[in-house]
Each structure stands twice: as structure tokens, then as C-alpha cells.
Amino acid sequence: VAFAFGCESASDIRLHYFSAKNYEKNTKTGGIYKVDNLNGEKVEIMICDIASYLIAMYYMLSFNSEKSLIFYWDEPTISLDIETSHPLHLNINELWKKNLISNIILSSATLPNENELIDVIADYKYKFDNGEIHTINSYDCKKTITLINSEKYTILPHLFFEDYNDLLNCVNHLFSNKTILRYLNLKEIIVFVKYVLTKYDMPMFYIDNYFKNIENITMNNIKIYYLEFIANLLSNITPDIWKNLHTILKIQQTQYWIFCDNNIKKIKSMDEIIKPALNNDIHRANSLQNNPIQNTILNTSLEGIYLSSKDAYTLTYGVSIFFTEDVDKIGKFMVLQSNIPSLILDNITKNIENNSKNNKKIEQLNKIFEDKTINYAGKERKMEKEFFSREIQQILNEIEILKNKIHVISLDEQYIPNTQSHKQKWCVSKEIPDSILNYSFRPTIDEDSVIQIMNLDVHFQRKILLLMGIGVFSLKTECETNLNEYLKYMEIVKSLCNQQKLYLIIANSDFIYGINYQFCHSFFGKDLKNMTQQKIIQSLGRVGRGNIQQEYTIRIRDDAIFKTLFLPLQRNIEAENMCRLFSSV
């Protein structure tokens, strides 16, 4: 394996030790000391970014014949949902024009179909002497990932579309895009079919007639059956009859979660919850008493996203992700709704500041110590403390005193989602069965990660969120002037996410394509406007990569996203951009 990232020439390519043919050995250890990265005779796989592709291509061609190479392009539609110019567009166009490898695999869950890429295919065939085109489509319905709206109701086509023609268009669209079938809740399908069959005579859709044997009753086949069932039903009823039937089905539907909240007060505006200060600090909207639940003011329009308090138990099995364009607003909301007293926040702030000052003093003293003991290096006896001068011993004593002044930064468990104390605080008034509470997922942030984050020059809100088990993926916010510190923060958060130690990730839409971690639930904020169908499908695909038997949900705050997902595209911007950029002219 070799790697080409951010390369300006072939000399920037790096080989894994197993791929090295020429190298120097360490005379003491016998291991590889220095690799000749310019000799790639043993390289079988080159992993690169788009900007480095041409350099990587020429490198591989210098050791292999063109016909023996395969160019595998993962997610070639990244940035193609943007109509205006994007920095990647120039790279993509140059890559396509200068590419010399004819065996190309374009891999994406949202790749436009052949009919939409006629110009791209023609360009490819002209360049590579009538090259062959093969299309592979696959979809997996071995698990159900439930779509839920802002009112906590499961969403399926028959429950979403009151309009007869919209539902018919949706069914035809899903027949052509079966990957969306995994997001249709099996239980609701069965409820719908059973009810309709009691009202309408459809003998060909009786289970015994449709499924010839029990082996045919699979999740895939049931969902295909559902589409055919709707199509047949609509062909035998009028739009007015469907409208009445839809109304009845909506009335009969129950919420996905129906547990009662006895001590909740309601208000009208989120502005009464969040009162941001000009300096973007976190402030409490009101004082806290002994029973914070009874004093919590909640907004009915925000039901289902109180993820740091009363809705936390609904996040089960593993890490969840919340997509939003304003990550700081959602982060602030999570902190405020956790009801952390201002006194605790103030103490954490002071402890972080004191730790930072003491760590800087320790660094300075360590530097002085190293400078004064440089002549002792290699002399083990002299490096023992009792052989140091009084001045050096004084430095060591000062370092020890400062280390003892370092505070452990932590939160009480009642403020950490889904810990036992947190459940007792927020779930006591609900009739939630243990079978659900036992699977609610709690974060497990290790002390080393906490220390690293607290020592970084990042916004205080990010640090509090981390203590709660919540990470943030964003490089856009105004407060992020120190980019290197935030990049370090994100690497730590990514590592915690990969280890399933976080409870929740808050991310903006830039990270939809770049996240390959295992998520059990996702949220779409109301501010995700103008999302293309392809980007929605990519976002949905972040969830449900784990155990088949687990429960997965996707909770969408804006109904417009359901409409975009379920109906045929009026215009495919990604296909248009591919035809424009994947051109050798």
C-alpha cells in the first residue's frame, strides 16, 4: 500500500513498509530505518485524494501497464450538488481530462443512472476506444431504519401523502430507487395492509395468494409487496376515497414514543429558552432549584430533540448524529437543557483556566530543567534526584507542587446523558419499560481525552459538551480563529466516535460525505434547507451499519425533506455537473 495526500510531486508519496523494495535498516534494531519512496515496484494499492490523483496515476503507470490498473473513485459526486463553482470542480475536471487509466469504477449510492450520464459515457467511449459500460445496482432491506417526523410519528408514503397523484408518483419513484425501501417501517406496513384488506376486496394480495411459500416472505419482498399493494389500491379507488382513507389512517396512527411527561411546562418560542449573550457564552435563562425538571420550560415544537434531558433515553445502542448548519446553536441548546447550574459552569471555567496557567508554568520549568541537566544525559547515576544540585531539586519540587494543583475536570453523572443518575432525574415521571431504558446509550469519555480537550484553545462550549459526551464536527463557526487547535479537537472527537465512546455528534452538512462511523440514530435540523435528494440519501446512509437486530431511527424536523426523498427529481443537479465536469473537451 502507498499513500498520496496533498502531493506536489512523486517525492511526496509515502510507502507502507511492506510495499518498500529499497530501504535502509537500523543497525541497532534491524528494523526499517529509511524507505526509498520513489521505487513503487511492490505497490499494489495506491490511496490518494483528488488533488493528488494525477501524480499517483503517473507513479503507478511507471511500474505497471495501463490495462493492469483499476481507477476506483469513491463518491465521485461529492460537491456536485452545488450549482455554483466549487474548488473541487476544477480538480475533478482536470482529473477526468488527463486520466490515462481506462478501467474506471465510479462508486456511489447516489450515482446518476446511465440515461442521465449520456454525455459522460460518450466522452469515455471516445477517449478509450469504445470502452464497455457496466452498471451494478444493489439495495439492502435486511433491516428497518425508521423515519420519524418532528411530532414523533413514523413516516411512510401512505401516511405522508394525502394527494393521490403524489402517492402514485412516490410508488413509481421507489420502484426505481429501491435503496430507499430500507427506510420504510415494517410494522407500519403490516398495520396498513391489514386495515385496507378489511375494507377492500383484494384477493390477489392476501398473504397466502401473494407469497407462494414461507421462504418468499423476506423483508425485501414484503416492501416490494407494499409498493405493489398501494399501486393496485390506487388503481381501484378515486382520489377522494384515498383522501378519506388517508385521514382515517392518520387518526389511527400512534406516536413512535408514547410515554407520558407529567411535569412538563410548555411555551411558544425557543427565544425564551436560549438567550445568547453577545460574547457567545453560555447563560442560564433562569435559576435552578432542587427539582430542576419541574422548572424546565419546554417548547412543544422541539419535542424529541431534548437529547441532553428528557429525550436522551430514546438514543439506544450506540453513537447518534445531529445534522445542522448551526452547530453552536444546537450545542448551546444541549447545554442549557441539561440544567447544569451556573455555579458548576463557573467552577469548571476557573479550573480550566487554573490548569492552563499551571501547565504553562510546568512546561517552562521542564524546559529549564532540561537545559540545566543536558550535561547529565546518558549518566544514569547522576540523573538520580539526590545527585542534582539544590537549584535543580528546587525546580523539580516546584513542578511537583504545580502538578498537585491540577484539577480533574468532570461533571456529575446527573448531567451526563443516560447515566443512572441522569435517568432517575429525567425518566422518573415516565412509564418507560426497562426493556427500553436498559438499551439507552451512555458516553464513556476517558480521562486522557478530557485532559487533551481541556488543554486546547477551543470554545468553552465545546469543552462542556465533551464532558457530556457530545462532540462537534464543524470548521465554519466565527469563534474558530485558531484552526490548528480545532483540528486537534476534531481528531480526538473522531477517535472517541470511532471507539463508540461518545453519545452524540453535532455536525454540519459538510461532513455528510466524510463520516464513515457507525451511527444508530440521526437527526436532521430544520435549518437544512435546499438539500438535494442525493445528499439526503447519503445522510440517511450514515445510520444502521451495525447489528441487524438493533433499532435504528432517522428523525427529520422538516417535512420538506420527506417530500424531496419520496418524489422523483424535477432536476438532477449532480447529473448536470457530472456531464459538465466529466468532459475531455
Locate predicted features.
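Hydrophobic beta-strand segment of the Class I
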Residues: S522
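Conserved C-terminal RecA-like helicase domain
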Residues: V1-C48, L54-I70, P76-I78, I82-P87, ...
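Interdomain hinge/linker at the junction between the two RecA-like core domains of SF2 helicases
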Residues: E114-N169
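A conserved mid-domain beta-alpha-beta active-site/ligand-binding segment of alpha/beta enzyme cores
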Residues: I180-R182
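Short, surface-exposed amphipathic charged segments that create phosphate/polyanion-binding patches used
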Residues: R14-K25, L147-F161, L569-I573
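Conserved H-loop
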Residues: A109-N115, E325, S509
